[in-house]
Amino acid sequence: MNDSDVFKILLIGDSAVGKTSLLLRFTDPNNFQETSVNMTSVDYKNKNITIDGRTFNLQIWDTAGQERFRTITSSFYRGAHGVLVCYDVTDQLTYNNVGLWMQEIQRYGVLGVSRVLVGNKCDLEDRKLVNASIAQEYADILGIPFIETSATTGVNVEEAFMAMADEIYRNHIGGSKPSVVKPVCGSPPRTKKNIC
């Protein structure tokens, strides 16, 4: 596998939106235990995926709590192909801060970096404060995919990371545009990619 077969993906967003849980649920779903997530123990994890018959290594970086102290620097963004911008659907402030995270991507990120907007904790339907249609409208304005996930139940977690990988593949490798699936919590996935 050469350098062009490695996609560096960042997870950013406010503290406690579930970035580390999303990372662990995606990279090690069989051993995921929400109560065991240590916010400062994860730097990055790898997972191999296949797109159009070609294997890619997703190198997924987590801020590991640094966002609380605003210590995320340009070096974190260096070489990134994609960014999952995460918020908590039960916390309006985390959604309101998405624009600030988008500005930070523009300030520090690589020109043309792929982005996906992720509303996490969609399993907490009775506590939901951020309407999916509002987030979808914002994502449409930015021209990026939007998806609601639940790291707790696993709903749409794989789909979020695959949407990111598809965006990177299309923008950096030149693959054809995939059919866009923008599921909200509870929506069954329409297509599935081959995961190794």
Swiss-Prot record:
Binding residue positions for GTP: 13-20, 62-66, 120-123
S-geranylgeranyl cysteine lipid sites: C196
Protein keywords: Cell membrane, GTP-binding, Lipoprotein, Membrane, Nucleotide-binding, Prenylation
Subcellular location: Cell membrane
Pfam families according to UniProt: Ras (PF00071)
Record-level GO BP terms: vesicle-mediated transport
UniProt short sequence motif Effector region, positions renumbered to this chain: 36-44
GO MF annotation: an example: GTP binding
One GO CC term on file: lipid droplet
Membrane topology: Lipid-anchor
Stated family: Belongs to the small GTPase superfamily. Rab family.
Record protein name field: Ras-related protein RabG1
Species of provenance: Dictyostelium discoideum
Name of the encoding gene: rabG1
